[in-house]
């Protein structure tokens, strides 16, 4: 389902003003990636970057070029595990999230 521009703008605005929402979206992104829903997980991470750290700042902190990061987090992105972890760690730091792992039975 294609999202409307207004919906996207609403989500980005809420990420900026609601830390709990941003944390929930981060959790959703990681869960999607772990469940093999790569497109969805990368899309959510991209929204988090747009609304919080910005691609320019993420590039500065990770050492990747902005265009590389845009490609990495695109629907067709195929980041290596090392690069993806570097990006997610940087997003966590920016959002003040301390990840914890809980395994389901």
What does each model-identified segment do?
Residues 50-71:
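Short alpha-helical DNA-recognition segment
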Residues 5, 9, 97-105:
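Short, charged recognition helix plus adjacent turn
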Residues 1-44:
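N-terminal flexible/basic segments that precede or flank functional cores
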Residues 82-98:
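DNA major-groove recognition helix of helix-turn-helix/homeodomain DNA-binding modules
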């Amino acid at each position: 389902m294609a999202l409307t521009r207004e919906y996207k703008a609403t989500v980005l605005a809420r990420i900026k003003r609601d830390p709990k929402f941003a944390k929930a979206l981060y959790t959703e992104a990681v869960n999607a990636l772990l469940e093999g829903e790569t497109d969805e997980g990368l899309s959510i991470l991209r929204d988090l970057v747009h609304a919080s750290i910005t691609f320019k700042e993420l590039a500065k902190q990770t050492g990747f070029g902005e265009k590389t990061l845009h490609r990495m987090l695109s629907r067709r992105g195929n980041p290596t595990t090392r690069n993806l972890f570097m990006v997610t760690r940087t997003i966590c730091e920016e959002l003040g999230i301390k990840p914890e792992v809980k395994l389901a039975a």
